[in-house]
Swiss-Prot record:
Ca(2+) 1 binds at residue 11. The carboxylated form is one of the main organic components of the bone matrix, which constitutes 1-2% of the total bone protein. The carboxylated form binds strongly to apatite and calcium. It comes from Diplodus sargus (White seabream). Ca(2+) 2 binds at residues 15, 18. GO terms for molecular function: calcium ion binding; hormone activity; hydroxyapatite binding; structural constituent of bone. This is Osteocalcin 1.
Length: 45
């Protein structure tokens, strides 16, 4: 399902992830999908 997220959905995930410094750092290295699911669980879309 990760490949089917819209840019708007990805941006909203980034906004959540950026509130958590560890998640933001992981996003920079692993990507937003991996970082979000690691810290917040399954993507809700």
């Amino acid at each position: 399902a990760a490949g089917q997220l819209s840019l708007t959905q990805l941006e909203s995930l980034r906004e959540v992830c950026e509130l958590n410094l560890a998640c933001e750092h992981m996003m920079d290295t692993e990507g937003i999908i991996a970082a979000y699911t690691a810290y917040y669980g399954p993507i809700p879309y």
